[in-house]
């Protein structure tokens, strides 16, 4: 089964073609990602209207490129998978309407995919990970620990009660005068800094709840920067290093609790199979090497296999959307042409956080 994937949920326009064999491995035939970073950099963050217009301008061209790179014609595509949420509604509309048009024109089925499920299943695509496993999803819009029991069966253990980790990186970078996107800028600056110079909090550390919180850390960074202003390059490096150290300590503490919860449901003594259970990280922030090293250390200590997909598949991409769509189609599912994009779409809609949900419900 050959699928075309389309991803337009935020500030990357992405298309891909994969070859999927039910019960076997999947092969990525093409994977195209067009970043809008230059469009949004002057504003220090993603501007939804600019993002939607950029998707409109480039998506058709990228669909054709994905087909060309995969040496595939549109008539040879068996199904179309598209991100239907969560994300920026304008961008989602662009992708969903294009997928519907292709479905109508070709008569091929189309499936609306949860963007978070794409991230959740990426390790199955890249490493053939077996269920169940623990997922840490860290991106600009989400910070969650998820127990992945199987396709369509997700248990959200913890989520952020305020800022997502990627958002905290971007806001901290902007505060320090570093360029957008903030994650790589903070990581680069931190390499030259003293992580012990600036005392910063570790939000929720020691608490039994499994949620995350980063707004207090961001506030502490602002206060520290104000106290020593004007900032020199050395000051910026030290604050960046101290911030990153606080983040990795917090991630270690929160994920440690999630691993304990995992082993309560799935005792390691009863685990069967040639490989230990997996701790998987996904999302754009998973590119941070300090976070990866922290998670690798934690996994080794707790008897888990640590899996981080290639960097190109950690950030938003359409190959993961096509793969998630293939999993759903293999279960006999497909979407009707009257479905509407969802700006909020929790992976586990039965597991909403008690704090920080807002009037519109959980952010996902």
UniProtKB/Swiss-Prot annotation:
UniProt keyword Iron present: yes
Gene3D superfamilies: 3.30.420.40
CDD domains referenced in this protein's UniProt entry, alphabetically: ASKHA_NBD_TsaD_bac
Reaction(s) catalysed by this chain's protein: L-threonylcarbamoyladenylate + adenosine(37) in tRNA = N(6)-L-threonylcarbamoyladenosine(37) in tRNA + AMP + H(+)
Organism domain of life: Bacteria
HAMAP family, sorted: TsaD
Record-stated family: Belongs to the KAE1 / TsaD family.
Binding residue positions for substrate: 137-141, 170, 183, 288
Alphabetical list of NCBIfam families matching this protein: gcp_kae1, T6A_TsaD_YgjD
GO cellular component terms, A-Z: cytoplasm
GO MF term (any one): N(6)-L-threonylcarbamoyladenine synthase activity
Sequence positions that bind Fe cation: 115, 119, 316
Requisite cofactors: Fe(2+)
EC assignment: 2.3.1.234
This protein's name: tRNA N6-adenosine threonylcarbamoyltransferase
Gene Ontology biological process terms, A to Z: tRNA threonylcarbamoyladenosine modification
Role of this protein: Required for the formation of a threonylcarbamoyl group on adenosine at position 37 (t(6)A37) in tRNAs that read codons beginning with adenine. Is involved in the transfer of the threonylcarbamoyl moiety of threonylcarbamoyl-AMP (TC-AMP) to the N6 group of A37, together with TsaE and TsaB. TsaD likely plays a direct catalytic role in this reaction.
Annotated keywords: Acyltransferase, Cytoplasm, Iron, Metal-binding, Transferase, tRNA processing
Subcellular location: Cytoplasm
Cofactor note: Binds 1 Fe(2+) ion per subunit.
Disordered: annotated span: 341-364
Keyword Plastid included in the entry's annotation: no
